[in-house]
Amino acid sequence: MSRGIAFLMGCLLASDLFAAEVDLMGARSCGKWIEERRMENSTREMNRVPALITKSWFLGYLSGRAEATRRNFLKGTDSDSIFLWLDNYCRANPNKGLDSGGVDLARELMQMKGIRP
């Protein structure tokens, strides 16, 4: 009996380990995104590189969310629309991270397309 209780307690304690937040690598703040977007119009090619890197990261992040959730919320959505949405989101939320924007955009796209979360 006590072995069974110990086993159940171990399972319950271990489940808390899996409930922890995941650290995201490469996520930038919205304030940094706005700054990079301003530099994107520069005549110096090197000034445009950070925005290109962040765009690639964000599209990868969204694609990863779509794959992980098995919800094809990106279907029919073009990159320009995604970046316009992100520009508006980041102007309104400069202290948030792009990962938070990705979560909100995914939720909004699923709602618009009638996809259950």
Task: Annotate each language-model stretch with its function.
Residues 94-117:
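C-terminal partner/receptor-binding element of secreted or periplasmic proteins
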Residues 2-10:
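Sec-dependent signal peptide recognition
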Residues 1-2, 23:
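N-terminal Sec-dependent export signals
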Residues 20-88:
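Short N-proximal segments of mature Sec-exported proteins
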